[in-house]
Amino acid sequence: MKFGKVVNYHPDKGFGFIKPDDGTVDVFVHARQLIGTSDLEVGQRVSFETVLDQGRGKYRAEQCRVLD
């Protein structure tokens, strides 16, 4: 499990990005992966798992939960 902070989120589009605490590259998150909420806000602390998106070659967040 990783932890990080929401750096942007577009509720109208249902996606955004999380900056992981470990300093790695920002991670894409889709609204379908949110647990216990339907939206995120910039600055919120979250926990999440990362999965490599084979099609894009980048990591995305899954099982994202707000900590605050």
Positions of the model-derived regions?
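Short nucleic-acid-contacting surface segments enriched for D/E, G, S/T with interspersed K/R
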Residues: 34-47
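A short macromolecule-binding patch
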Residues: 25-32
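Conserved positions in beta-strands of structured domains
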Residues: 7, 19, 62-65
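Short aromatic-glycine-enriched beta-strand elements
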Residues: 13-18
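Structural detector for short beta-strands of small beta-barrel domains
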Residues: 1-11
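OB-fold/S1-family single-stranded nucleic acid-binding modules
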Residues: 51-68
